[in-house]
Swiss-Prot record:
Gene Ontology MF: a single term: zinc ion binding
Database matches in Gene3D superfamilies: Classic Zinc Finger
Pfam families: zf-met
Compositionally biased intervals (Polar residues): 283-292, 299-310
Name of the protein this chain belongs to: Zinc finger protein 346
Assembly and interaction partners: Forms a heteromeric complex with XPO5 and ILF3. Found in a nuclear export complex with XPO5, RAN, ILF3, ZNF346 and double-stranded RNA. Interacts with XPO5. Interacts with ILF3 in an RNA-independent manner.
Entry keyword annotation includes Cell membrane: no
Major place of residence: nucleus
Covalent cross-link site, Glycyl lysine isopeptide (Lys-Gly) (interchain with G-Cter in SUMO2): 114, 170
Binding site for Zn(2+) 1: 75, 78, 91, 97
Organism: Pongo abelii (Sumatran orangutan)
Amino acid sequence: MEYPAPAAVQAADGGGAGPYNSSELLEGQEPDGVRFDRERARRLWEAVSGAQPVGREEVEHMIQKNQCLFTNTQCKVCCALLISESQKLAHYQSKKHANKVKRYLAIHGMETLKGETKKLDSDQKSSRSKDKNQCCPICNMTFSSPVVAQSHYLGKTHAKNLKLKQQSTKVEALSKRLTNPFLVASTLALHQNREMIDPDKFCSLCHATFNDPVMAQQHYVGKKHRKQETKLKLMARYGRLADPAVTDFPAGKGYPCKTCKIVLNSIEQYQAHVSGFKHKNQSPKTVASSLGQIPMQRQPIQKDSTTLED
């Protein structure tokens, strides 16, 4: 039996640990365009996917070398906003960030290098639409079937990551005008507060966010929102509208009574509790009225004592 030469085995294995390393034999067989893309991906892999940076100097070096992916105020790979220096260092040195970078490169490694984007022709654009059923570039996830992909795109995780990506785009636009990263974060918070006022983007009653008005309309006619409206009307009926406990508790988590510091599971339990003696005894109005009756009870006693002395 004949065994292949060690050089041939090394050439077949690729000669390296990285997924984008290629042998001279493969490079000789590949077209120029494919070899160029492979070289770009290999350079990006070496620049980003090495060991996790340790210390401030390595983190700053990584940011300067890959400004298309990382900045001092945001990580485009993780869709994370970095509002302080300590948060920036902790994020870029974390294992979670390193794993997401590897997944990002597995999807985008052939397309991105130092801010350059490949120009796609019509065929590539049509293939990109088909790739949506295979992977989600926003969440860095892969799918086994179009059904799983559609379920992901309609889920909360994708909506949350899409919102974070939109926020990171706003941060990038603001950072071009504002040099102070902390001023950028405060300005972004102001924009977020304005969005929370828009009912097509945020439901203050259920603490839910929406990507488009159609999704918002579906929420407002849904069972969850109607249940919250019923709860609010019930609170108002029993004099609880001005109680901040209605908004302090998470949406859909029972019926809170801040006076007694308990949460009831149903409307019937809440009605029975509010009508009961224990709740009325703990009510501030009852305590105030009982305190006001104390001097009224002492006055007739004093008058009786004076009449007896006379």
